[in-house]
Amino acid sequence: MNRNQMIENIRIACHCGERRAGEYLEAELRSLRELQLRNELRYDDLETACSSLGLEYDCVEYFLAALAA
């Protein structure tokens, strides 16, 4: 799944515009990166990010790839 697909899924789940959905996604990624930098990132943090955005847990793969980049 790519960034545009993630934004579209968030937009649908949150009933918001594309810009707002992108902001939500970036905020979650920032939070996950902070946890990663402190060596405190756990798998359930990725699931929580999905849940917070109204996404299915299969979107964890996107976050893993984004954090690895």
Question: Where are these predicted regions, by residue range?
Answer:
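Amphipathic alpha-helical segments that form the core helices of the histone-fold
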Residues: 23-39
